[in-house]
Amino acid sequence: MSRRYFGTDGIRGRANGLITPELALKVGQAAGLAFQRGEHRHRVVIGKDTRLSGYMIENALVAGFTSVGMDVLLVGPMPTPAVAMLTKSMRADLGVMISASHNLFEDNGIKLFGPLGYKLSDDVEKQIELMLDESLDKKLAQSASLGRARRIDGVHDRYIEFAKRTLPRELSLEGLRVVIDCANGAAYKVVPEALWELGADVISIGVEPDGFNINKECGSTAPQALCAKVREMRADIGIALDGDADRVILVDERGHVVDGDQLLAVIGQSWKEDGRLAKPGVVATVMSNLGLERFLAGEGIALLRTPVGDRYVLEQMLKDGYNVGGESSGHIILSDFNTTGDGFVAALQVLAMVQKLGRPVSEVCRRFDPLPQILKNVRYRSGRPLDDSGVISAIQDGEKRLNGHGRLLIRPSGTEPVIRVMGEGDDRDVVEEVVDSIVDALGNAAAAAA
């Protein structure tokens, strides 16, 4: 069955475009019905980021859940990993995060978590999706069985304590000057407070949300302001979260960005040395740099690759028993602590290493030199350009040229008629020639099919 609503990270789209109050109401009803098992009183935790449309979607979801007899616990603006954690700790049947993650304010989304704090399986999402297109009027609760909604106090403190417990109790961040960029998003209150409680000298930016400025020229997808602030304040480290704080990138004391691949390298190596790796392996996606794979191999650590998307990384981790995984974009999953990506918890592990080693971030977090990587997109109108004989030949020729010295990844986008061509290797000029050859062949095939 093709999926009309759910993508790789819940339901996401333009607010009042795809994401309407009507859809949110229906999602609340369908998800509420899907998770009402047993005779106990059922309840759902709902959190959100700071987008203007969050109010609209939150109220519609509340109406949907309460109409099928579910009680609603509202926690307000909170990081996605906090909502996942609270869903489990508050013994809820379901968790919901209203967010479009790193997108700008015009978009919004609905992420769903099961009772243990994990994102829903494909099968459960399909079950909910089927109900979205049918009438649920006959399944609504009777008047005396409707749900109630209440706002929960103290949830910020719960997440702060949870995050602090991922570090040794005796560890202090005293002496570290930290610039934190919360992307004007969900973490704008809790993360600066947590860093202060741990003893850091905290300088905060991206902590003045107005409903419109989430991820706007700030956060993990736009770290330029953070880089400048780190240099200006002569800070030891910068931390950039995205709008819902499930991804992170760091900035060293020189103002240089440290991406998710470098974070996987430093955490993987450090945890292996400390005997904390569950197995000698790290899970990443097909987009992670070949330099990471080579570095880990030199440390006796395998790199397992999955399709793009943190849900696939987590699935592989749970299936094979690995406890470190993530994406180059900064989704870092440490399954000893979390059931989903947690940007702040990942950053704390690196801060702990910096304190332990007594060395600057530029030394701690630069474990390998990334190979030159080139990514180009080819748009097409119709047909199947990847089946064209000229394209197949160009790909085969490219693989021969890069054999042993690089790799190719050619994949169609899951959301638009675009084919992404990524190449990386030791020689940038060769990689560029190979990628351009494939792009030209795809362009010719697309033009012929138009």
From Swiss-Prot:
Q: How is it modified after translation?
A: Activated by phosphorylation.
**What GO MF terms are annotated?**
magnesium ion binding; phosphoglucosamine mutase activity; phosphomannomutase activity
Its Enzyme Commission number(s) read 5.4.2.10
Keyword Plastid tagged: no
What is the catalytic activity of this protein? alpha-D-glucosamine 1-phosphate = D-glucosamine 6-phosphate
Q: What residues bear Phosphoserine in this entry? A: S101
- Which keywords describe this protein according to UniProt? Isomerase, Magnesium, Metal-binding, Phosphoprotein
The UniProt note on the cofactor reads as follows: Binds 1 Mg(2+) ion per subunit.
Q: Which residues bind Mg(2+)?
A: S101, D242, D244, D246
Pfam hit, one? PGM_PMM_II
Catalytic positions?
S101 (phosphoserine intermediate)
* Covalent S-S links between cysteines: none
Q: Which NCBIfam families match?
A: glmM, PRK10887.1
Q: Which HAMAP family match?
A: GlmM_B
Name of the featured protein: Phosphoglucosamine mutase
**Can you name the source organism?**
Rhodopseudomonas palustris (strain TIE-1)
